[in-house]
Amino acid sequence: MVLYTDVCIFEEYRKRLGQYQADIVTLMSFRDAALSFQMIEGPGSGRQFTARRRVRLGDATPNGRLRLDSVARYLQDVSNDDTRDADWSDPHWWVVRRTVIDVHQFPEYMQEIDLTTWCGGIGSHWAERRTRISAVDGTPLIDAASLWVHVDEATMQPSKVPTDVVDILSASAGGRDVNARLLLRDKLFNESNVNTSPWPLRFADFDAVGHMNNAAYCVIVEEFLAAHRDVRAPLRAVVEHVVQVEPGQDPVRHIASGNADLELQLRVGSTMHAAMWCGLNP
């Protein structure tokens, strides 16, 4: 028999636990949230795909290191090559929700590199794609994880991952389930001391489906790295896409100042369209 007082005590405990958990979230920062992401090891069993390429002139900084926007393009390219090689029923209608890039060592201009990609986990409407960029001798240079959401072509709303794709990815996913919750949530952003500046859009920022391309967001992170030469490998960069940026809009960068790392929201009016963090990865 459960006494009334026992129920009251339990309810009070549950309320306090909920408040405690809420307080923990409130105390977190963009940095804490970004570094909490666990980059899974691999590749293990199951399908993996490898492509080799060279760091070319337009991919590198004047000092010769591979830029992060180039990394984002490489990730897109090898993902697309993999889906075509595996003959997915729907290789096109996927959008990136989040990209996490861990740089152990920056590839250099004219260096040959291998990109190996595999599935790190599956959800009902999305999948995590893990990619490792390595030197040709096998030395890991960059690890990345991108959360790709499958969308309906007509409505652009999330749609279930096709059965044939699940069958292809299941072995490498190893039973790992992933969710699409944001890491860099709005309430974690430090609003106390923010600098703002416009981010003018270019025609070249938009891709074949009319989206501001993932690589274009990483250009914003590169601007930070150009001004902070002390932030180099090992580093982590996180870019999350919340609301699509449309042609003709006027995005504004909101940057929390006074930090050694980048803490940024890209907003149009009061709406957060993207969130970014970049800093040293201890």
What do these predicted ranges mean?
Residues 25-112, 225, 281-282:
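Hydrophobic, proline/glycine-rich low-complexity stretches
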Residues 27-30, 34-39, 44-46, 50, ...:
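HotDog/MaoC-like acyl-thioester-processing domains
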Residues 197-280:
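Acidic/His-leaning functional-site neighborhoods
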